[in-house]
Amino acid sequence: MVCIISFISISTSYANIIENFNFKNITIEDGLSQSTVKTIYQDSKGYIWVGTYAGLNRYNVYEFKQYKHDEYNKNSISHNYIIDITEDKNGHIWVSTISGLTRIDTDKDEIKNYYSEKDNCNLLDSNRWRLLTTKEGKLIVFGINGVNLYDEEKDTFNSIALKENNLNTAVIYSEEEDSNGHIWVGTDKGLVELDKNLNLIKSYEDTIGEVEV
């Protein structure tokens, strides 16, 4: 009887919570650049950033501002196919695309793009960059060919050698920092745990693959 009453109580409370949610469908008719959403991120100012296969969108609850690549405009994003989004400690928005990385200064409305090693920014070549800003303010870029750490003073990237783990050849699906500052990386080869200095703690193999955290 106690179990049944508890279950009913929990179910009723859950139903009441659900009733308090309001849902709204947002489409291209509302200003979204494309209907296939790849990633969503909320910044410190409350803006919702939406990455699609056809451009980047910033939403302020009322309207969208679109960011698209323009080969004739240096103040445009590196590509329209968006992979991931994060915000650094200075409030700049970083966006990874299949072509490069983009940094957006929303206060000045300035954009700077970073490409692979051929552009002298030391960014390892990849078309699936994943981004993470740690609690200490480090900007880490995970790619298929390795890991990069952003050097703010030099405005460039340093390649991090990760020994005895499978990140250097893995496809990275997701990454997350825990309360201890450890970084968990989900890959097609399993789960990898790193310390805050990106040293390997442990690898967890997955026979199925495509681990997300």
Model regions and ranges:
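Carboxylate-rich, polar loop motifs that coordinate divalent cations or form catalytic acidic clusters
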Residues: 1-213
